[in-house]
From Swiss-Prot:
EC number: 3.5.1.96
Species of the source: Vibrio vulnificus (strain YJ016)
Cofactor note: Binds 1 zinc ion per subunit.
Cofactor: Zn(2+)
One GO BP: arginine catabolic process to succinate
Domain of life: Bacteria
Biological classification of the source: Bacteria, Pseudomonadati, Pseudomonadota, Gammaproteobacteria, Vibrionales
A Pfam family that the UniProt record links to this protein: AstE_AspA_cat
Protein name per Swiss-Prot or TrEMBL: Succinylglutamate desuccinylase
SUPFAM superfamilies listed in its UniProt record: Zn-dependent exopeptidases
Function: Transforms N(2)-succinylglutamate into succinate and glutamate.
One Gene Ontology MF term: succinylglutamate desuccinylase activity
Active site residues of this protein: E219
């Protein structure tokens, strides 16, 4: 076996802020090339890299305390190094925010996953990371066929959810909801797929909007510390990611995800803002049409559709930020290889 790029592992070395990380590379006996660009950023290039090769970003740690994705990525990288994992796709593995991970917190100064638009933002540690990640994505996707580009941004939810795992497809100007992407979701046994209805400022949206990548934000269970995640809950996802990297068709059966559309985004407008439920409410909790579930100033917040459900409720966001998504279950179909709904 070729000498490892890592003293311990990709994840351990990334989190060890006491040791420096230098850019370096190695070629495995099977011809696969590993390039460590910087702390937490590893590029893997297959021996037979060509115009037909997929170019896949697998990112984790955008929120520092969401550790299950980091552990999944670390195991895949280890198996690539040993030769156990076949590599036919060019991959960029990212563990984004080790300082926040070591502090067991989502972020240090600013929510990193709201910094990938082109708006002016206040200086912060996270803004520096976002700018670096934008450059890395550009370099990775430059001179690659549009149809080869994928980005799976892996997260965990803060709260419990009626769907243990779910994926969010960002809204872009481009055809970024291909049948291949939906097939990936279904083979991963991800329980729900949310179709966003407006642009956002997330990492996956950035790749989809600016590089037409087939991109998802994937929410995998709940936040836990490294070593405390039950990775067996994500066996199907792990297998499907590995099959994607090997460019083979999964052998296990798919489980179709329930599809939702985002019906609206609740943005906090007033200091006097609250929900009528406590912080233990689950993602995808639904309401009857007309049911009041909170207020913003003197305006009641109420369900505008039967069984309209709430996702990512956060009563503590700053004024002007998203306080929740409201979603409705839909029947979707494919037109010209793209997932659409009426």
């Amino acid at each position: 076996m070729t000498n490892s790029l890592f003293r311990q592992s990709f994840l351990s070395d990334t989190l060890n802020m006491q040791q420096s990380v230098e850019a370096k590379a190695t070629t495995l006996s099977n011809g696969v090339r590993l390039q460590l660009h910087q702390r937490g950023v590893l590029e893997v290039i297959p021996a037979n890299n060509s115009a037909e090769t997929k170019n896949i970003i697998l990112s984790s740690g955008i929120h520092g305390d969401e550790t299950a994705p980091m552990e999944l990525i670390d195991k895949i990288v280890h198996d690539i190094e040993t030769g156990f994992q076949d590599v036919q796709a060019r991959c960029l593995f990212i563990i984004a925010h080790p300082e926040a991970t070591n502090a067991h917190t989502r972020f240090i100064e600013e929510n990193l996953n709201r910094l990938f638009d082109e708006k002016e933002h206040q200086p912060s540690k996270e803004l520096v990371i976002a700018d670096q990640l934008k450059l890395l994505v550009k370099a990775f996707f430059d001179n690659t066929p549009v149809e080869s580009r994928w980005h799976l941004d892996l997260h965990c939810a803060i709260r419990a959810s009626k769907h243990y795992s779910f994926a969010i497809s960002p809204k872009t100007r481009h055809p970024t909801r291909s049948k291949a992407l939906v097939d990936f979701v279904n083979h991963s046994h991800v329980e729900a797929l949310l179709l966003s209805n407006s642009p956002s400022s997330t990492f996956s949206w950035f790749s989809a909007e600016y590089y037409s990548a087939q991109a998802l934000t994937m929410e995998l269970g709940r936040v836990a510390r490294i070593g405390e995640n039950d990775l067996s809950r994500f066996t199907a996802l792990d297998l499907t990611m590995r099959d994607l990297i090997a460019e083979v068709t999964p052998e296990h059966l798919p489980k179709p995800a329930i599809t939702y559309r985002v019906s609206r985004t609740i943005v906090r407008l007033h200091q006097d803002f609250d929900f009528r439920f406590d912080d233990q409410v689950e993602n995808f909790t639904s309401f009857m049409h007309g049911e009041v579930f909170g207020h913003d100033g003197d305006k009641p917040l109420m369900a505008k559709n039967d069984n309209e459900a709430i996702v990512f409720p956060n009563r503590n966001v700053a004024i002007g930020q998203r306080a929740a998504l409201m979603v409705c279950e839909i029947k979707a179909r494919f037109e010209d290889d793209q997932l659409v709904y009426d």
